[in-house]
Amino acid sequence: MQAEAQNLTGVWNGLYSYADGRSVTFVATLIDSGSTLSGSTHEPCVGGDCPAATLFATLMGSRVGSVVTFRKTYEATDPRWGTVNYDGRLNADATEIEGRWTIAGVWSGKFMMIRPLREGLKEEQKESAKS
């Protein structure tokens, strides 16, 4: 696949789940600058004692090949809404990232992020299949 197709910049829809089965949807905007990732997320607050109905966070991380890692830091000032570490793997089409999230010593679970296949890439793949 072309390097351009592997660029992760864009809007991703995600879901993370807790060990007890509860899950939370989120939207992430990623900026891929080579091996460095940055961006932001927003998600509904589904637990009690939330600082706001919608939680916002910043993302900083990296990508090496198919391995994607980043830290999500919530903008809330309460220390309970701190940093979450994400470790995932990118699929071959660069449309899904799947892996685990952890809050050191407190919580962990699975996550998945998806984005639609770029229109231009769809056409390139159709042409490749014909050859």
Over which residues does each language-model region extend?
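Central antiparallel beta-sheet cores of small beta-barrel/beta-sandwich binding domains
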Residues: 2-131
